[in-house]
Design a protein with these regions (language model features):
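Conserved SGNH/GDSL esterase-like catalytic core that processes O-acyl groups on lipids
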Residues: 46-139
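Alpha-helical cap/lid subdomain in secreted, periplasmic
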Residues: 106-245, 257
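Conserved catalytic region of serine esterases and O-acyltransferases that act on ester linkages
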Residues: 228-302
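Residue-level detector of flexible, active-site-proximal loop/helix-junction positions
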Residues: 44, 70-73, 165, 212
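Structured segments of extracytoplasmic/periplasmic soluble domains
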Residues: 47, 54-62, 72, 124, ...
Length: 302
């Protein structure tokens, strides 16, 4: 009985502590000489940032350094384990001249964190757990404490990347957690974002998931044009990763509008980048619609 009461008391204390946890956070910088952005994430941060250098170049913005630390499917908790173990499991990409370069395929979390005095560091949960708040509640303060300890700039803004719900036909192993229901997953992600913003002092959110969901209600969605057995469905290329055309473009526009407009004063609206340097070019009309979806999403999360 005594052991039970001690265990119960410890659990209550842990719950009470998590309820009180907040993080020290700072605003986005205003018109810095060089803006430095690091994404600590997984394949969904890859999807979100892949076309950001192209948008920056088209906007005439050449004073932004963007980098991403990538492990496929990496959770908040795993980032913390990677740090504790000092393992070199990350691929580290960096853009200093609006073009991605692979810096290392065997990087540690510290390699990325200490590479630059980052102004903005983005974090996110793995898509599997993106709508399960207990995983965010445990992982966010742990990872942020590591960032605060190791990042050269003690006033870096910590920004949350909101990811997207799977396509309705997705066969992702985690989709049953959400009843194989896209709207249920989307609502769960939104709820997690809202709670995390309040609990952990995360005012700035990159709402890629919101922008993608908005776009799914437009002609950009292909769910009425291809059979539901198609892998390329509802702006995904496999049921969960974004298509290399409109999907990734929408997400990059969302990153741009969230981070570049408030810091450097340039909106993504009217950006002329049409992916002509890739195999996935889009029309100016479609680009404009993607940009509008991104802007609408960002306004909803201001």
């Amino acid at each position: 009985m005594k052991r039970f009461l001690l265990t119960l008391a410890a659990l209550i204390a842990a719950v009470d502590l998590s309820a009180q946890v907040s993080i020290d956070n700072y605003p986005l910088p205003q018109h810095p000489d060089t803006l430095r952005i690091l994404a600590v994430g997984n394949s969904f941060s890859d999807d979100g940032t892949e076309y950001l250098p192209g948008l920056l170049e088209a906007a005439g913005v050449r004073n932004v350094i963007v980098a991403r630390l990538y492990i496929g499917g990496c959770t908040l908790e795993r980032h913390c384990r990677e740090y504790a173990d000092g393992t070199a499991d990350y691929i580290y990409y960096k853009s200093t001249k609006n073009e991605w370069v692979t810096v290392s395929r065997n990087a540690t979390l510290l390699d990325g964190l200490k590479d630059e005095p980052w102004d903005i560091i983005t974090i996110q949960q793995a898509s599997d757990d993106s709508g399960l708040y207990d995983t965010n509640e445990q992982g966010i303060p742990k990872l942020v404490s590591i960032i605060r300890k190791e990042a050269p700039n003690p006033r870096a803004a910590i920004v949350w990347h909101m990811t997207w719900a799977y396509a309705t036909n997705s066969d992702h192993r985690a989709f049953p957690r959400y009843g194989n229901d896209q709207l249920r997953m989307y609502d769960a992600i939104r709820s997690c974002v809202d709670r995390a913003r309040k609990q952990f002092n995360l005012p700035v959110v990159i709402p890629s998931g919101e922008a993608v969901q908005i776009a799914r209600g437009t002609r950009l969605n292909n769910n009425g044009k291809v059979p539901p057995t198609s892998k390329v469905y509802e702006l995904t290329r496999d049921g969960y990763h974004l298509t290399r055309q409109h999907g990734r473009y929408i997400a990059a526009c969302t990153w741009f509008e969230t981070l570049i407009k408030p810091t450097l004063g340039k909106s993504v609206l009217g950006n002329s980048y049409l992916l002509l340097d890739t195999e996935h070019s889009i029309t100016a009309k479609d680009a404009r619609l993607c940009q509008k979806c991104a802007v609408k999403a960002v306004k909803a999360y201001r």
